[in-house]
């Protein structure tokens, strides 16, 4: 049997049991839905792309969070074969691209219902794994119509804990090779997911009620397709910096204005992180 939790608002976490069903596609940080807006006319969509890059001359070196063989808890599993990397700020030394940043629209004007059907058909569930005593992926963007599957590939106990704004607090023991399903509603900010048994473990989940979001790749690149034409507000967020590339510091959570033209690609080029802003 598999536990399914439904979380939202101020109510208590609901719960029910269902039989284990079919397996699911790997989660993708691609458009999957849109709510509460008037659909754009067919073909009136464009694409936003760009790269989140390190703005300093010296690239921060890769660092270990837990050195090989040095885990304080469950060392027979955690960091036994290799060090657990520090993923808070990872910069590609060749391209200066910054991985694992969120790129998304704030209060998008318009919708793309075709993208909803396409991605929910292909990937109705998104997955967060506890593997080798770390959460993978470290950063995950999902739509609230997807089911979040949190599982453990490890043969040791973990737990899953988060406290959010729109979703009820959650804290659940994860047995070895265990699995739970969670339904989340949209949040304005990333949710921090932690394991208290292994205090170094964490991940970030951003939940949207629209389809216009992405996560930056290994070279810092991001692309959001199917965006309704017109002026939109784009936000870039990275764990160690917070909001990036905003035009008005007083409204940094609103991002920057971007004009989308139907059938065209709006290329923002490189959006640089100022090293002085790293926390």
What are these regions (language model features)?
Residues 1-6:
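N-terminal secretory signal peptides that target proteins for export/translocation
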Residues 25-279:
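Extracytoplasmic copper-binding redox domains, predominantly the cupredoxin/blue-copper superfamily
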């Amino acid at each position: 049997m598999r536990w399914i939790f439904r979380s939202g608002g101020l109510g208590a976490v609901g719960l029910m049991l269902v039989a284990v069903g079919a397996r699911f596609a790997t989660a993708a940080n691609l458009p999957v839905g849109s709510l509460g807006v008037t659909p754009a006319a067919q073909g009136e969509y464009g694409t936003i792309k760009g790269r989140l890059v390190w703005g300093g001359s010296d690239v921060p070196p890769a660092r270990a969070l837990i050195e090989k063989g040095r885990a304080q808890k469950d060392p027979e599993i955690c960091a036994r074969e290799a060090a657990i990397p520090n993923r808070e700020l990872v910069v590609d030394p060749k391209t200066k691209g910054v991985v694992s940043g969120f790129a998304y629209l704030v209060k998008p004007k318009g919708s793309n219902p075709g993208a909803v059907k396409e991605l929910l058909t292909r990937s109705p569930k998104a997955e967060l794994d506890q593997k080798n005593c770390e959460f993978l992926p470290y950063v995950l963007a999902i739509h609230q119509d997807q089911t979040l599957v949190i599982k453990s590939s490890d043969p040791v106990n973990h737990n899953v804990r988060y406290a959010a704004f729109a979703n009820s607090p959650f804290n659940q023991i994860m047995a070895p090779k265990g699995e739970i399903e969670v339904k989340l509603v949209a949040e304005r900010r990333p949710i921090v997911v932690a394991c208290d048994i292994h205090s170094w473990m964490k991940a970030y989940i951003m939940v949207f009620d629209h389809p216009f979001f992405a996560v930056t790749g290994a070279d810092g690149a991001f692309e959001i397709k199917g965006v309704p034409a017109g002026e939109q507000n784009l936000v870039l967020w990275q764990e160690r910096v917070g909001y990036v590339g905003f035009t008005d510091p007083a409204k940094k959570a609103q991002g920057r204005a971007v004009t989308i033209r139907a059938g065209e690609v709006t290329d923002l080029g490189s959006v640089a992180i100022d090293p002085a802003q790293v926390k």
